């Protein structure tokens, strides 16, 4: 019986302290979500910048590959034209 009364007393104290805490919230606890929002925005901005940099690097690599392919195609076409002209000259 004494143990159960002690337990009931603990529960009453617990709920009483919870009620006081809810009625008077800690100002620092309220400031934490507000401080976390700029971090999320800066993280999103950093991720966007990294994505843009990656996309720019991929575009530059693609352009360089296309330029190499175009130069190779032009060289092959010139060689084929020269071979055709030489064969036509031989008759």
Swiss-Prot record:
First-listed, main subcellular location of the protein, grouped into a coarse class: secreted
InterPro entries: Antifreeze_1
Superkingdom field: Eukaryota
Keywords for this protein: Antifreeze protein, Repeat, Secreted, Signal
Tissue specificity remark: Detected in blood serum (at protein level).
Maturation-removed propeptide residues: 22-39
Cellular component GO terms held in the UniProt record: extracellular region
Signal peptide interval: 1-21
Localization in the cell: Secreted
Gene Ontology molecular function: antifreeze activity
Family (UniProt): Belongs to the type-I AFP family.
Role played: Contributes to protect fish blood from freezing at subzero sea water temperatures. Lowers the blood freezing point. Binds to nascent ice crystals and prevents further growth.
The name this protein goes by in its record: Ice-structuring protein 2A7
């Amino acid at each position: 019986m004494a143990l159960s009364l002690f337990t009931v007393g603990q529960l009453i104290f617990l709920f009483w302290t919870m009620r006081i805490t809810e009625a008077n919230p800690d100002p620092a606890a309220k400031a934490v979500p507000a401080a976390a929002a700029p971090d999320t925005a800066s993280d999103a901005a950093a991720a966007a910048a990294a994505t843009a940099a990656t996309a720019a690097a991929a575009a530059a690599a693609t352009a360089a590959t296309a330029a190499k392919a175009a130069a190779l195609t032009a060289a092959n076409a010139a060689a084929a034209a020269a071979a055709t002209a030489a064969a036509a000259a031989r008759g």
